[in-house]
Design a protein with these regions (language model features):
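Helix N-cap motif at beta-to-alpha junctions
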Residues: 108-112, 151-153
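Conserved core segment of the aminotransferase class I/II
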Residues: 3-72
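Short, solvent-exposed loop/turn elements at beta->coil junctions and helix N-caps
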Residues: 7-9, 91-92, 130-135
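Conserved glycine-rich beta-strand-loop-beta hairpin in the small C-terminal domain of fold type I
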Residues: 65-79, 91-106
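Short beta-strand segments
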Residues: 6, 20-22, 96, 102-106, ...
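PLP-dependent enzyme catalytic core of the Aspartate aminotransferase-like
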Residues: 121, 136-158
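Residue-level detector of anion-binding/catalytic polar loops
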Residues: 125
């Protein structure tokens, strides 16, 4: 059973994007049965708005290229800071994103909540420690999601 999900939620309208599922025909038929009884109806106006905006796959690619141009410098800056300040100290590791909107950062066990609290004291807004986990319950208190998309490049440099 393999399902792949996608969404335009962070691409177009936060919380109002359209979603898609890629799976086998059998899985698709199964999920269609479930969704039929779980929702009153799809937001067809919103679907039309997205179809008209993107037009085709080339429209999606062009829009994503604009996103990349805006956020790539921010991700490169954060990557450089992490490399310069953290890598040699052995106090954390991270996954360099290949798309998406977050760095997955893993601090030493038991430190994530404290790191996020210290960042807040310094005036830096962070995603809550453990946010990738259900109910933010990270058993090791080590995972922080770094989202450099919101602040300006100048703010990130500070």
């Amino acid at each position: 059973m393999v399902f792949e999900f996608c969404s335009t939620s962070k691409v177009t309208f936060p919380g109002a994007g359209v979603a898609g599922i890629c799976t086998s025909e059998k899985n698709r038929e199964d999920i269609k049965k479930r969704l039929t009884i779980q929702t009153i109806g799809h937001d067809k106006i919103n679907q039309l708005r997205h179809a008209r905006f993107f037009k085709d796959v080339d429209g999606i690619k062009a829009h994503m290229a604009k996103h990349a141009a805006l956020i790539r410098p921010k991700f490169e800056l954060v990557e450089n800071i992490l490399t310069d300040e953290i890598a040699s100290r052995g106090i954390g590791t991270w996954v360099k994103p290949l798309g998406g909107y977050f760095f997955g950062f893993e601090a030493l066990s038991g430190c994530a909540k404290e790191i996020v609290a210290k960042c807040k004291e310094a005036g830096v807004t962070m995603t809550g420690a453990g946010s990738p986990f259900p109910y933010k319950k990270d058993p090791d208190d080590s995972v922080i999601r770094i989202a450099p998309t919101y602040p300006s490049l100048d703010e990130l440099k500070k």
